[in-house]
Amino acid sequence: MSATSILIAAAESGHSDENVLIPPLSELLIGTLSFALLVAFFFWKIRPQIARTYAQRTERIEGGLARAEAAQREAQALLEQYRAQLAEARTEAARIREEAHSEGRQITEELRAAAQREIAEIKARADAQLAADRAQIVAQVRREVGEIAVDLASKIVGFQLESSATQNRLIDDFIAALDNSAEGVGTVAAPVRPGG
């Protein structure tokens, strides 16, 4: 049977003076007392456990938030430290790079100066060698020219210059005359006669 059929059957049974919606007083007292006992039991046993669980969960959440904030602060501090180290490393790298450039320029200048000194030394040695070679060639040419001049003078004058001192003096005078004419003096010394 359904609830509707039960209500209809109760209405037909003849209890028309009672109100169905208002319970009897004994049931009302038992229901109220049961509800009061249930509420008292709730406040005495269940509410402290719920409050304790709620406090623990709140504490756990707040602790988790505090730990998360602490971890975030620590991560931020590590990030700042990393950024500072990175900036320091960049500054150090720039300083090292500048020192390397400076040392490179200094080494280049030193090598350039050493090369210039070496070039100057080589040039000085070459100039000295050229001067020595020139002096040797000039002396050799003078000697050969003197010998040719003595031979020529002997043939022109018709007699042999026998004295080597006379030959040497004649050669020296002739070369001096050639030097003077080369310098633009224009005077040629008179040839030395044999015997004076």
From Swiss-Prot:
GO terms for molecular function: proton-transporting ATP synthase activity, rotational mechanism; proton-transporting ATPase activity, rotational mechanism. The chain crosses the membrane at residues 24-44. Its main location: membrane. Belongs to the ATPase B chain family. Disulfide bonds: none annotated. It comes from Frankia casuarinae (strain DSM 45818 / CECT 9043 / HFP020203 / CcI3). InterPro entries: ATP_synth_B-like_membr_sf (IPR028987), ATP_synth_b/b'su_bac/chlpt (IPR002146), ATP_synth_F0_bsu_bac (IPR005864), ATP_synthase_B_chain (IPR050059). F(1)F(0) ATP synthase produces ATP from ADP in the presence of a proton or sodium gradient. F-type ATPases consist of two structural domains, F(1) containing the extramembraneous catalytic core and F(0) containing the membrane proton channel, linked together by a central stalk and a peripheral stalk. During catalysis, ATP synthesis in the catalytic domain of F(1) is coupled via a rotary mechanism of the central stalk subunits to proton translocation. Component of the F(0) channel, it forms part of the peripheral stalk, linking F(1) to F(0). Pfam families: ATP-synt_B. This is ATP synthase subunit b. NCBIfam families: ATP_synt_b, PRK05759.1-3. The lineage of its organism: Bacteria, Bacillati, Actinomycetota, Actinomycetes, Frankiales.
